Amino acid sequence: MHCPFCSAHDTKVIDSRLVAEGDQVRRRRECQACGERFTTFETAELVMPRVIKQDGSRQPFDEDKLRAGMQRALEKRPVSVERLEAAIGRIKHELRATGEREVKSRVLGELVMAELRKLDEVAYIRFASVYRRFQDLNEFREEIERLSREPSKP
């Protein structure tokens, strides 16, 4: 790393510590040329995969769009913002854990449905009705029956 004071390229790390709950490394460095000390911070670059839509188009993962869809399903339901944010974090973690550069929107939709089912069954049905394009009352009934037959995964 080059020195911000004299632009020399020969710097030495004299101390490293984890900060931000282990998500960042703070390093104290010393320039070998001028002797000045400075601090750097290191974080992992977490790149989210692109989303392949049903029509084949590709777009960047949009956390705001994910949050808005889940909030719409959870509207007027007794689920805290903290629980919603934790669910979003788990979805993002699952997407990154695939190791893929691109993921089909269907995979993302199924992850959202699984998280909503854990949060609130009414929100799950709301989301499923739009996501799976329910056409009539029977489709709602079938999904509710399936929901009551299959235990929710923690």
From Swiss-Prot:
Its cofactor is Zn(2+). Belongs to the NrdR family. Residues 49-139 form the ATP-cone domain. The keyword Lipoprotein does not apply. This is Transcriptional repressor NrdR. GO terms for biological process: negative regulation of DNA-templated transcription. The keyword Transcription regulation applies. It holds the Pfam family Zn_ribbon_NrdR. A zinc finger (unnamed) spans 3-34. NCBIfam families: transcriptional regulator NrdR (TIGR00244). Keywords: ATP-binding, DNA-binding, Metal-binding, Nucleotide-binding, Repressor, Transcription, Transcription regulation, Zinc, Zinc-finger. Binds 1 zinc ion. GO terms for molecular function: ATP binding; DNA binding; zinc ion binding. Negatively regulates transcription of bacterial ribonucleotide reductase nrd genes and operons by binding to NrdR-boxes. It comes from the Bacteria.
